């Protein structure tokens, strides 16, 4: 029987370690998000809303970027980690209040993820890259930032658009879709066009793209 190459053995150990620490961080994110008091139904079963959002983010990321880095996978899964702790209602219900809320959330989510990554052996460079992704720095200039933005937009259109559009004025929804479309890459837009949208939703998308 041929002996295992020592260098291959070291590489295998490193790969197992890297996989193990990623799984550990994702599990910690899931545990945190399972505390979300807001429940939604998944196949008739109540689950934590932000836990489900994290799973959907990871699902779309695996479709777009099968070889995504650990940092990108963590940023996708942790995009809304413990979001319910900073509700929109804590800020003025105007554009300035919305922007302040969003900026606060970016820092909050990054602050939640940093100790989880440190605990599992991720270095400062990886943590800072995570922060840049969560804080939406580098969209349109950095491939990972753009990939994450594509995933965010696709998850919104695939899972949350129907609920959103019936709660807001059509002109506002058209404007939101137009802005969402502009954030996506051509690849993301192509995937969006393949989504099985309801006729009313598709009509809004068509108006947004034609406007």
Task: Give each language-model segment a name.
Residues 89-131:
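Helix-adjacent hinge/juxtasegments
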